[in-house]
Amino acid sequence: MSQRLTTALVTGASAGLGAEFCRQLAPLCDRIVAVARRADRLQSLVSDLAQQAEVVPLVADLNGVEGVARCMEAIRQRGPLDYLVNNAGFGTFGHFIEQSIDSQRDMVSLHVDAAITLCRAAIPFMREQGGGHIINVSSLGAFLPGRGPAVCGATKAFLNHFSLALQQELVGTGIEVQALCPGYIRTEFHEDMAAAGFDPSRIPDEMWMEASEVVSASLAALGSGRALVVPGARNAELAREGLAEQLAALN
């Protein structure tokens, strides 16, 4: 009987947090299914991590049913997942009324629909094997309505609520669910937002983190039972302030 391989599936794996998750999971895994739209970036990841883990590139656009279906099939074919990282996403800049409705619907599809569908596909296998880890990449913006794009923050707030609820539902199964809520990260994500009008120079230097720091904080928190992880002391303070403002609105 062949030995079961430790396997991870990471979406949005071609750059930024996704690529960094692949790098830091490589020493922990035998195989990583890396999902993204850019085939050339995935091939670079295959080469970079060849000495540590088998990286299986899966070119798919999770904004559509076909791309999500390809991921679900990969989960079935590659066996139980030990790690599922729902990281694929994009940001916009500006008020809701200034954005096209198509881009906002695409954001909901990618951030919410794709994440819950892949969780639904992975959990039965994880439960059967006695455990696993699900990391849903959320955002500090989930705690701060009104301080960022409305739909983006709302989708991330959904992921927080979903992750907390799922963690409760899965008590006793060995499956751990985490919503990772980073603030500003030096990645292409914020570079793309800068092209849309976001001014990164307005953000104090101490608010920025490296992708490696964020991923390290996420993986270090596994096993702690913490369903919400906010890397960075200042970010955690802002999250608490945002929650306090929401509670105050009830009065």
Give residue spans per PLM region.
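Conserved glycine-rich cofactor-binding loop
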Residues: 14-15
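Conserved glycine-rich Rossmann-like NAD(P)H-binding loop of the short-chain dehydrogenase/reductase
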Residues: 29-44
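Conserved NAD(P)H cofactor-binding loop of Rossmann-fold oxidoreductase domains
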Residues: 87-92
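Substrate-binding pocket helix/loop in short-chain dehydrogenase/reductase
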Residues: 95-97, 103-108
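Active-site helix of classical SDR
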Residues: 119, 155
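Residue(s) in the substrate-gating loop at a strand-loop-helix junction
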Residues: 139
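C-terminal helical subdomain
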Residues: 179, 199-238
